[in-house]
């Protein structure tokens, strides 16, 4: 079967986007997702994004996202930005703002006149059981309004914030994000048994109260050039710890995101993420068996 696709990226976090809205797509197996995402024998991507018809009232579209290991995940902020550019560029909507069904609810995406996309990422969740994170038997340490949890990582105790942005994140503050051994500690944190759904590991260097450098080791994808939900989780943790003030410029290897959150006044407030979305190329590929 021939499969039309669009290759896109948001700040270097790249996606294969498939249109299941105007045409019927067969259910994709994990092996097929891995083959399409393979950078040597397939198209190459961190994740695969499906555009579908919504199944809930009040949504214009539905999106599903799969990591390059074939597993379906809850949410991706960079993918959400690419999503709204895709549906507008392909004439599926003329709206500047669209409401999109994701696994954990409905989010609002807005295309700005400058070409950047603003995503209402929803409110962060800090309760360990809802992240989910098993904090049983651990003695947490308070910093500001946050609780830091000790996690043994390769023989060293790391103090982490746990945050859900619809998907789980473990955030730690480091002195130098560029020099930190992300690809050593990242896999150990990702698969720590206290995270029953595995976890995205964020390593944040604070430059000022409005600026950070961030690297994220994503579950099922490894280190990516940018992670939208990871940027939101890191900023939320930093504000809650009293280290950051909104808005925050987040520098990643792939580009810059701007995160705003009024969480110092109301933790139920949504995080707003602004950043680029870029189409790289379009093509047709034979769907692997």
Swiss-Prot record:
Annotated pathway: Amino-acid biosynthesis; L-lysine biosynthesis via DAP pathway; DL-2,6-diaminopimelate from LL-2,6-diaminopimelate: step 1/1
GO cellular component: cytosol
Pfam short name (any one): DAP_epimerase
Top-rank taxon, per record: Bacteria
HAMAP family: DAP_epimerase (MF_00197)
Function noted in UniProt: Catalyzes the stereoinversion of LL-2,6-diaminopimelate (L,L-DAP) to meso-diaminopimelate (meso-DAP), a precursor of L-lysine and an essential component of the bacterial peptidoglycan.
Protein name per the record: Diaminopimelate epimerase
Organism: Burkholderia mallei (strain ATCC 23344)
Gene that this polypeptide is encoded by: dapF
